[in-house]
């Protein structure tokens, strides 16, 4: 739940379809993920501003500097799911500067933005308060409270979900290096 200068926005997070991205968001929001912007134990998003607002497009927040240039001190890969698209207003998605540059910044759409599909990870949608999203102005502040409903949500470990996702990235990189070395060995053997 986002509590903003304008009112409350309730979002449903897609933790089963984008566990790494949701894990990052939840762990930061609850103050459980190490980062360079705030001490561990302090909820990351509390007091941050919506630093970028483009009417009839989206509102963006999550930058610790309030300028759009900040991050938590790390970046992580995109996590696209075929069922999750920017198909209408109220889509919660990661803001980034290109592939693999996700951190803490996010945006919520005012309208459908299909040109962002495959470029920005969708990880939730507004279920209450789209009128508040539409009323947010640049500089409005937020706090984020994670409302865990049901046994699955209560027992879900956000930090573990994010670390698992990051571990898969490391495995993908190592596998790619192994394949490149194999190819290099094959090419070298022919000379």
Show which residues each predicted segment covers:
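Cyclophilin-like peptidyl-prolyl cis-trans isomerases
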Residues: 1-191
């Amino acid at each position: 739940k986002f509590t903003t200068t304008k009112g409350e926005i309730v979002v449903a997070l897609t933790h089963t379809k984008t566990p790494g991205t949701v894990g990052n968001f939840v762990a930061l929001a609850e103050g459980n993920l190490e980062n360079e912007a705030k001490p561990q134990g302090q909820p990351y998003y509390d007091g941050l501003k919506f630093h970028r607002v483009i009417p009839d497009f989206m509102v963006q927040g999550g930058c610790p500097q309030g300028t759009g240039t900040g991050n938590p001190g790390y970046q992580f890969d995109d996590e696209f799911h075929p069922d999750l698209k920017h198909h209408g207003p109220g889509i919660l998605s990661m803001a980034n500067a290109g592939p693999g540059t996700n951190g803490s910044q996010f945006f919520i759409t005012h309208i459908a933005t299909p040109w962002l599909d495959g470029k920005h990870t969708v990880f939730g949608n507004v279920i209450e308060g789209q009128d508040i999203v539409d009323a947010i102005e640049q500089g409005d502040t937020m706090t984020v409270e994670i409302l865990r409903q049901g046994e699955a949500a209560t027992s879900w470990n956000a930090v573990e979900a994010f670390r698992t996702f990051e571990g898969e990235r490391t495995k993908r990189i190592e596998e790619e290096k192994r394949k490149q070395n194999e190819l290099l060995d094959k090419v070298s053997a022919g000379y």
